[in-house]
């Protein structure tokens, strides 16, 4: 466990709203360096301004988490600015409603891209950095958190694509 979060680095996807934004606020209060990631520039800009006003060191990036090249660049930027992150919150998520047989291939690709590949990219890119940091310093601690959903326990109607991912 991490005992003192001051000066530690957190990477938060979906940081422009919801859980991601709330976790960024908590991180700022705890004195963390924040890497804010969102696909919506206006939400990212607002979150960045709020965290900087709270005194946090912020690296903000507009990134489509489903895009491997964008995520690879994000990981390189994080490594260069802060080193290995102590916390990675793979939080970005989307859902397409409607009848599953009426959803388009684009709908499926969008939801699978963000909700599945976003997590895959976050884990595959940041885990090696974190393991290297822990090998260099046995006292170093880090955590990866992947957002889950109540939909894994209680299925909502007309959310077929989203629900197909929850039960993988």
Predicted regions span which residues?
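Residue(s) in the substrate-gating loop at a strand-loop-helix junction
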Residues: 149
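Substrate-binding pocket helix/loop in short-chain dehydrogenase/reductase
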Residues: 99-100, 104-109
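Canonical Rossmann dinucleotide-binding motif of NAD(H)/NADP(H)-dependent dehydrogenases/reductases
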Residues: 2-34
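Active-site loop immediately N-terminal to the catalytic Tyr-X3-Lys motif
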Residues: 101, 154-160
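Conserved small/polar residues in nucleotide/adenosyl-binding loops
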Residues: 167-168
């Amino acid at each position: 466990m991490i005992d003192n979060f001051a000066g530690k680095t957190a990477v938060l996807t979906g940081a422009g709203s919801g859980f991601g934004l709330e976790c960024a606020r908590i991180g700022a209060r705890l004195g963390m360096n924040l890497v804010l990631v969102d696909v919506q520039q206006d939400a990212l800009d607002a979150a960045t301004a709020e965290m900087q006003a709270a005194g946090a060191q912020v690296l903000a990036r507009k990134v489509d988490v489903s895009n491997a090249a964008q995520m690879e660049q994000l990981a390189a930027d994080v490594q260069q600015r802060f080193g290995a992150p102590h916390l990675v919150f793979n939080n970005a998520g989307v859902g397409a409603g409607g009848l599953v047989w009426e959803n388009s291939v684009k709908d499926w690709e969008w939801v699978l891209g963000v909700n599945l590949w976003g997590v895959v990219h976050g884990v595959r890119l940041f885990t090696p950095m974190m393991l290297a940091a822990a090998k260099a310093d046995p006292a170093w601690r880090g955590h990866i958190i992947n957002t889950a959903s109540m939909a894994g326990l209680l299925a909502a109607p007309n959310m077929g694509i989203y629900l197909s991912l929850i039960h993988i």
